[in-house]
């Protein structure tokens, strides 16, 4: 079994003094159903699972129930599991197919006899009202593909290594060179394998890159099917075109999405909701341009200027030629890792709670990422994939600008930890050391 960080959050939810229903959100194929089942097997005597896609007739259970007692009677007739108060988890899966759950969950929680877990895909587009459940009734946990640390766990790398990395990050100390080289090798693997559980499981089992790429293509095919099934009919072609264009757009020099690639003379206003669909479905990650790199970043966001990434770097690398994937796996220094590195960093920062922005100025240059930490400090980040990682004109210009008051910049690249002036250089695998959860 793959070890996941969300397990700690599930433990905290169960031990909280005030009971709430649990909602685990995230893209399809990231392991939501598996992790809830595994958690339930460890902590409950009985698990009642209702899947609204496998059994669509179950939606009728929630057709105007009078109260919790009436609904629980219906549930007991629908499942083959005894509902024992205090010892049963009732798990509603694929809840995007049962919008009535929004009204039902409040009185089920008030009843108090059982614990409830909800999960599903595309909740951001299909079940927006789920987040309108009154405060105190629902605990929402976001789940993502495996980050680099979780991937390393699958490769038998323990917490002691990451404790050491956290110390090096905090104290700006070099990582032991042997450990650094080993982690860079693992990071090259991660760039190809990514963090989709089925892909990682396959790689752990047989090490076959061919099998990895087949599973990755199947996942992307499933995402395309979701577009055909859940998006509005008039939007489907554009949404699919946008999704399929991500790899080529990230290979452009500025990586910014060009609307004319979707359709000649296309304007943002015509497809704004199509980009939102992909982001809200958790299959894409957006970084928005800002007018200036100052807090609060959200206030100067330009919605029509953005970079779009896949939710998993393995899906991106799997879109390129097999030779490219093998070159990445081998750490070939002659290829351009730019888009792959940047997608991996975007994915990592998003999984650690950050909204993503970037800054582009004709005069000052472009910063790959801007994030805002818990203290509302803006942190500029450049991602470099080659030996020239110490060349960063935009970073230097922005840090020197008297109106921006930025004290420190970070460069993530194929390097060890070092500090020169107000720029901190970090190995790219340290992107996960930034936290905003």
Where are these regions (language model features)?
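Pre-Walker A adenine-sensing motif
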Residues: 1-16
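Conserved lysine of the Walker
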Residues: 32
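Hydrophobic positions on the alpha1 helix immediately C-terminal to the Walker A/P-loop
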Residues: 35, 39
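Short glycine-rich substrate-engagement loop in P-loop NTPases that contacts/grips substrate
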Residues: 54-86
């Amino acid at each position: 079994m793959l070890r996941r960080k969300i397990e700690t959050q599930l433990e905290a939810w169960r031990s909280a003094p005030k009971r709430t229903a649990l909602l685990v959100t995230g893209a399809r194929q990231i392991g939501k159903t598996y992790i809830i089942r595994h958690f339930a097997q460890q902590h409950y005597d009985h698990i009642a699972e209702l899947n609204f896609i496998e059994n669509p007739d179950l939606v009728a259970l929630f057709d105007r129930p009078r109260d919790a007692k009436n609904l629980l009677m219906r549930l007991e007739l629908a499942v083959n599991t005894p509902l024992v108060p205090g010892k049963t988890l009732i798990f509603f899966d694929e809840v995007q197919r049962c919008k009535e759950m929004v009204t039902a969950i409040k009185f089920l929680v008030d009843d108090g006899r059982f614990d409830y877990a909800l999960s599903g895909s595309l909740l951001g587009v299909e079940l927006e009202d789920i987040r309108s459940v009154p405060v105190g009734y629902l605990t929402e946990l976001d789940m993502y593909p495996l980050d680099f640390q979780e991937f390393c766990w699958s490769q038998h790398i323990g917490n002691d290594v990451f404790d050491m990395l956290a110390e090096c990050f905090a104290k700006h100390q070099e990582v032991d060179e042997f450990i650094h080289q080993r982690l860079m090798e693992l990071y090259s693997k991660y760039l190809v394998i990514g963090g989709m559980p089925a892909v990682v499981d396959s790689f752990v089992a047989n090490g076959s890159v061919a099998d990895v790429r087949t599973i990755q293509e199947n996942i992307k095919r499933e995402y395309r099917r979701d577009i055909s099934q859940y998006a509005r009919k008039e939007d489907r072609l554009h949404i699919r075109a946008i999704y399929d264009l991500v790899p080529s757009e990230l290979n452009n020099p500025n990586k910014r999405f060009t609307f004319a690639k979707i359709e000649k003379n296309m304007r943002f206003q015509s497809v704004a909701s199509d980009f939102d669909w992909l982001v809200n479905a958790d299959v894409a990650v957006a970084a928005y341009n800002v007018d200036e790199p100052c807090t609060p970043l959200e206030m100067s966001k330009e919605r029509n200027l953005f970079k779009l990434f896949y939710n998993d770097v393995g899906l991106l690398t799997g879109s390129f030629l097999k030779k490219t994937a093998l070159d990445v796996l081998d750490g070939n220094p002659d290829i351009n890792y730019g888009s792959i590195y940047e997608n991996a960093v975007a994915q990592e920062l998003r999984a650690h709670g950050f909204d993503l922005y970037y800054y582009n100025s004709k005069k000052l240059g472009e910063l790959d990422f801007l994030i805002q930490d818990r203290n509302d400090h803006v942190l500029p980040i450049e991602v470099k994939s080659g030996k020239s990682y110490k060349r960063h004109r935009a970073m230097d210009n922005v840090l020197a600008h008297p109106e921006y008051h930025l004290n420190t910049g970070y460069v993530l690249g194929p390097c060890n930890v070092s500090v020169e002036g107000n720029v901190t250089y970090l190995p790219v695998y340290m992107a996960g050391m930034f936290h905003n959860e």
